[in-house]
Amino acid sequence: MSSNEKRFPEGFLWGGAVAANQVEGAYNEGGKGLSTADVSPNGIMSPFDESMTSLNLYHNGIDFYHRYKEDIALFAEMGFKAFRTSIAWTRIFPNGDEEEPNEEGLRFYDDLFDELLKHHIEPVVTISHYEMPLGLVKNYGGWKNRKVIEFYERYAKTVFKRYQHKVKYWMTFNEINVVLHAPFTGGGLVFEEGENKLNAMYQAAHHQFVASALAVKAGHDIIPDSKIGCMIAATTTYPMTSKPEDVFAAMENERKTLFFSDVQARGAYPGYMKRYLAENNIEIEMAEGDEELLKEHTVDYIGFSYYMSMAASTDPEELAKSGGNLLGGVKNPYLKSSEWGWQIDPKGLRITLNTLYDRYQKPLFIVENGLGAVDKVEEDGTIQDDYRINYLRDHLIEAREAIADGVELIGYTSWGPIDLVSASTAEMKKRYGFIYVDRDNEGNGTFNRIKKKSFNWYQQVIATNGESL
C-alpha cells in the first residue's frame, strides 16, 4: 500500500483535549462546590489534603473559566474539528446529592459549547473526569456506595437534557481503570484501617459500570443520535523475554485494563476476571438487574488515552529495578523516556489500536496523547518545541498505519493543546500544549498565551487531513 493510499478518513475529528479541573480554575466561583481535585494539591497519585493550606494550582488552573473565548479562538485558528473537555460535576451539583442543579454552572457550559459551535468545533464531553464532588466522598464514601449511582444518573440526565442540541459525543468516565491506581481520584475512595482495598476498588468499579450503562441508556433516550463512549487509560504490554511466564504476565497486565472496556463494550464480566475475583477473595455485590443493564446498554465507541507502553517480567532482578511508568511495569531497554520517565513508544499506539479493534469491532477515538516536557521561552519570545512535534508526528503516523490495517478510528484529540496543570504531578512545568501559558509551579505568571512552534505544525496537519505528516 503506497503512502498516498494511507490517509485519515473524511470527517476525522482532529482537535485537543482538556479536563475542567486542570484548566478552568475559578474553583469557588459560580456556585461551584469542592471536588476531589480541589483537595489534591500534589496530583492524583498523592494523598489528598482537606486542610487546603498548601498551594493547589488546580484552584486557578489556567483561568480557562474567564478566558475560554480567547482560547477557543486559538483552537479555531489551528483548525480544530473537535474539542474534548469535561463538565465539572460540582458546577452542576455542588455537593453531588442536590435535587436541583446549579443554574449558573449550567449556563457556563451553555456559553462554552455555544462558543465552540460558533467556530464549527464539535464538543466532546466527559461526564466525570477526576472531579467527583467532595460531598459524595465525605457523606457517602464515594463510589463504594451504591447510592452514588443515583446521583450520577441524575447528573447525567441533567446535562443530556440541557445540552441535547449542542453535544453529540459523550464519554461516561475518564480513564475508568485508574480507580485501581489512584482510588481517591478515580473513585472517591478513602480506606479505613484493615479494609480490603482491592475489594473496595472493584466494588466501586462495578458501581461505575452500572452508572455508565444507565448513562448510555439515558443518553440514547434523550439524544437519539448521540454517541456515548467509555474511556480507558490504554497501554500495550510487552513480555520482557520470550519466556512463557513473561508472555503470560504481559497478557495478565493488559487484561487488568481491558476488563474495564470488556464490561462496557461487551456488556459482561469476562471469565478471566471472574476467576481473578474468586482467587483474590473479592466479592462484588450486584443488585438484581445489574447484569441485564450492562448487557443491554453497551457503549457506542471506545475512547482511550495513550502515552506509553509497558513491559512485564517475572524476573525478581528486573522487578527490583523497575519504575518510572505511571501504571507500573519494568523498564523497556529499547525505548527512550520522557523527562518524567514515561517510555515513548509510537509503535505501541498502532498495536493498541489493533488490539482494541480486534477485540470489539467498535469505533475507536484517541482522546488523549501527548508529550509532557519542559518548554523554554527563547529571548525572542518563541518556543521551539521540535521534541513535541516529533513525538506527535511519530504517533500520528502509527495511527494512520492502524487505519490502513482496517481500524475504524474516528478522531484524535491531543492532550493539553494549551498548557494545563498536570494530573499526575499537579505542576505547570510539565507542559503538553501547542499554546504556552505563562504560569509557573509556584503559581506566578501573567497567564498570557503564546503560540509554540508546534502550533503552526498542528495547524498544517489538520488543514491537510494528516497528509503533511
Swiss-Prot record:
In its UniProt entry, what is this protein called?
Aryl-phospho-beta-D-glucosidase BglH
- Annotated Gene Ontology cellular component terms: cytosol
Q: What induces it?
A: Highly up-regulated by aryl-beta-D-glucosides such as salicin or 4-methylumbelliferyl-beta-D-glucopyranoside (MUG).
The record ties this protein, via Gene3D superfamilies, to: Glycosidases (3.20.20.80)
Q: Tell me its family.
A: Belongs to the glycosyl hydrolase 1 family.
Which EC class is the enzyme in? hydrolase
Active site, renumbered:
175, 368
Catalytic activity annotated for this protein?
6-phospho-beta-D-glucosyl-(1->4)-D-glucose + H2O = D-glucose 6-phosphate + D-glucose
Annotated keywords: Carbohydrate metabolism, Glycosidase, Hydrolase
| Gene Ontology terms, MF aspect | 6-phospho-beta-glucosidase activity; beta-glucosidase activity
Question: What GO terms in the biological process aspect are recorded for it?
Answer: carbohydrate catabolic process
* The enzyme's E.C. designation: 3.2.1.86
